[in-house]
Amino acid sequence: MFKVTFAFENGSEVEAFANAGDNLLEVARGANVAIDAPCSGNGACGKCRVQLKGGELDSKKTLHISDEEFEKGWRLACMSKICADVEVLVPDIASAYKSRMKVADLSSKEEIAIFEKAKNQVEETGIQLRNSLEVVELQMTEPTLDDTMPDVERLTRALRKFMNLKRIRVPYAVLRKLPDVLRASKFSVKCVVRVTPDDMFVYDIFDAKEDVIMGGLAVDIGTTTVSAVIINMATGEILAKSSSGNGQIRYGADVINRIIETTKPGGIKKLQDAVIKETINPMIHEMCRSIHLPENQIYRMCVASNTTMNHLFAGINADYLRTEPYIPAFFKTNSLFASDVGIEINGDAHIIMAPNIGSYVGGDITAGTLVSMIWNRPEFSLFIDLGTNGELVFGNSDFMMSCACSAGPAFEGGDISCGMRATDGAIEACTIDKETMEPTYKVVGDPGTKPVGLCGSGIIDVISELFMTGIINPKGKFVREGKRVRHDHYGMGSYVIAFEEEAGSVKDVEITEVDIDNFIRAKGAIFSAIRTMLSSLDFDVSMIDDVYVAGGIGSGINMQNAVNIGLFPDVPLEKFHYIGNSSLTGAYLMLLSTQAEKKTYELAANMTYMELSTVPTYMDEFVGACFIPHTDASMFPNVHQR
């Protein structure tokens, strides 16, 4: 056995032990060291870079590591085997920097404005913002020698009088604390209950003097990023908000790689633990700590995610989603509880899931459609969710059609050498001077934060600016020379946005021709899906009245730059509306309102799903879209290089 030491830039270390021949990336996974590996460790992405600091590794040379970098000790973890005791540095850009949890500051109100807007819009349609949770206050008579009714019977009798319901369920967790709470409170209590037309379920019991908050948890499980809010179920107030990288990322950047991982022994449990134990539960604990709310006072949870993430969250085999005829285990489920899957809130908390529409159009898109309000407008609207599994909806109050395209993780920083989530250190906006070719950029974080990488909105800006200034051609190849443009010995070009001395990382922040090519394919998948769906309805882009854009690619997405690169159709900019993380906002609405929850089920049931792989023209559309902005320039009459 050999000792493997993983060192981090903050000075911390993790030690593990491995046998000769063990793969370094697998050793890291076993030690819960989060090294980014979007390609699931097959050497294709070049993201799992580590630096050899001591000892030896048996490493294959790769195009992702230059000869100079190799001499400095840089290796790909997935291409390295253990052969001796070894110490490696895991740089921030390759490690938990991408998946670092962030609890939002709600004091500015900017973080919660989008939830308030959605709540008001839904309420204007007549949907009531009421749910089935209530706090019931009871004053019971104390037992005597003449009144020896058991405590639980005394409680249910009082509740029955209050609610006039025959069936009242008191779970073991409440029964266990019932005798002490009743006597300490002199039989004056508050109960947190769920009331349906058929029965009542008692979640918790408190002394009547206590202030009781009924907590609710809404979670958007993205393939790359997980976001969550804790709310007051009585008022709808956002109490805490958090985001984190999905712990599953180390098993692959896309759903197919993760499904393949589940076919290995123990794979389903491993993927479920990665999203629940390593991602969601720590987010819950940190949010609860920040607002001084006990975790067991969260009594309801809503999850919105794509179909694969739904299955992996629930610990259900997703392998049948990737093979014909692409059948999921469920579209919706109402029988899941926190204790079933290990979510560390009240064990009896009911988990509702936004309903899936198809094998690759999931609950995230139905939740987002609820927020977009397409279903309540006569105008023709296009809803685009820019995520790893790019999903689209087109329609109005009379009809809606949906489809999904495998855009990959590029919009959230995956498949990009210096890509990252929209968190501290991410370049989220950029301009480039045509004459000097010098960049000016904006970085997420406090003033003075140094750049570490590029998030989705920053990538869009950089590629658009490179094209509009003539630094790259429509194929994404570098055609101008300058101090920030360089080529390696293979002839591969790159543009340096921030040199190492300007950056907050151990290497230059740059974008390469490989990165640009990956992004062109991602944007091509989205645009070709739009064209294919519209063509199937005999529509063209001129008939689109509004475009609603959602996704966690950075709040400052420049719509003109997105049009410049051919991601979005060339329509007037006033038609574009950025609605943020609509999946999370939709989950919030479903959590808060029983009627909104039912409306989401109705939307899913009435939406037509188009399977793009069965449309003969889709691949032709995709090939045409894999240029900047497109092979057919007439589709983008308003895009002109400066």
Annotate each language-model stretch with its function.
Residues V27-A31, D36, K47-Y97:
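Iron-sulfur (Fe-S) cluster-binding segments and ferredoxin-like electron-carrier domains
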Residues E69-K72, L76-A218, T223, Q272-D273, ...:
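Nucleotide/phosphate-binding catalytic cleft detector across ATP-hydrolyzing
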Residues V219-T223, A228-I256, Y320-S335, A367, ...:
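Glycine-rich phosphate-binding loop of actin/hexokinase-like ATP-binding domains
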Residues G247-R289, D415, A426-T431, N518, ...:
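N-terminal phosphate-binding loop and adjacent alpha-helix
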Residues E295-N306, I463, V541-G551:
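Short glycine-rich phosphate-binding loop at a beta-alpha junction
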Residues N396-D398, F539-L603:
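Catalytic phosphate/nucleotide-handling subdomain of diverse soluble enzymes
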